[in-house]
Amino acid sequence: MSDSNLDGVLVLIPARMASTRLPGKPLADICGLPMIVQVAMRAREAAIGRVVVAVDETRVFDAVAAAGFEVVMTRVDHQSGSDRIFEALTKVDPEGKAKIIVNIQGDLPTIDPETVRAALRPLENEAVDIGTLTTEIDNEEDKTAPHIVKIIGSPISGNRLHALYFTRATAPYGQGPLYHHIGLYAYRRAALERFVSLGPSTLEKRESLEQLRALEAGMRIDAEVVDTVPLGVDTPADLEKARRILSAKSN
């Protein structure tokens, strides 16, 4: 995406304190900074546009603000990160200047800024409503693991897929690569507005995959192929790994 279009990009990072596996994880210390601040730093390093953190608790609000990042308070009862970022969008950009909304999960403190930028590339095609990311699965266990979401897509080029379905099953059948979906999204504003206006869809509820709502509504999702899956911090072991990675980079 050209630099001339970056003025219309808004990066929103949802942060939720009530994690079941790692409670309070937005404030977990990683190399002297709260994890949510580390994520905001990676987003700023991507240099694609304005960065705002959407929080649901005053302690997180204060920590993000103290680090010098823009932050907005949102309701605690949102059912999904998409709902939270939409509330944040209406608060921080009510005049509609942002035309593309990038949703970076608040538990990706080690994400490569280039990976963030890659999510924008599918939107170079005006027919695409939502851009996302994927990588080829090279671990045999991951191919059958339900927590690894697979993307079934038609190859558009060597580094992009047109998404036809997302599933926790091992698919598609037969010979050929399987792809791991990475849950980082770049929405056209109109697509996000439509997405949150729709109720949960049949397949979304069956697979517990929010992105299926968009596909069932006829929206187009394309996925850029990247080299690796960013580390999502969901457990104490993940947190220790993130600390090691960022500590090594700072030395």
From Swiss-Prot:
GO molecular function: 3-deoxy-manno-octulosonate cytidylyltransferase activity
SUPFAM superfamilies listed in its UniProt record: Nucleotide-diphospho-sugar transferases
A GO cellular component annotation in the UniProt record: cytosol
Catalytic activity: 3-deoxy-alpha-D-manno-oct-2-ulosonate + CTP = CMP-3-deoxy-beta-D-manno-octulosonate + diphosphate
Pfam (any one): CTP_transf_3
Enzyme Commission code(s) on record: 2.7.7.38
Single GO BP term: CMP-keto-3-deoxy-D-manno-octulosonic acid biosynthetic process
Keywords: Cytoplasm, Lipopolysaccharide biosynthesis, Nucleotidyltransferase, Transferase
Location in the cell: Cytoplasm
Pathway(s) it belongs to: Nucleotide-sugar biosynthesis; CMP-3-deoxy-D-manno-octulosonate biosynthesis; CMP-3-deoxy-D-manno-octulosonate from 3-deoxy-D-manno-octulosonate and CTP: step 1/1; Bacterial outer membrane biogenesis; lipopolysaccharide biosynthesis
Protein family membership: Belongs to the KdsB family.
Described purpose of this protein according to its UniProt entry: Activates KDO (a required 8-carbon sugar) for incorporation into bacterial lipopolysaccharide in Gram-negative bacteria.
NCBIfam families assigned to the protein according to its UniProt record, in alphabetical order: kdsB (TIGR00466), PRK05450.1-1 (NF003948), PRK05450.1-5 (NF003952)
Protein name: 3-deoxy-manno-octulosonate cytidylyltransferase
Gene coding for it: kdsB
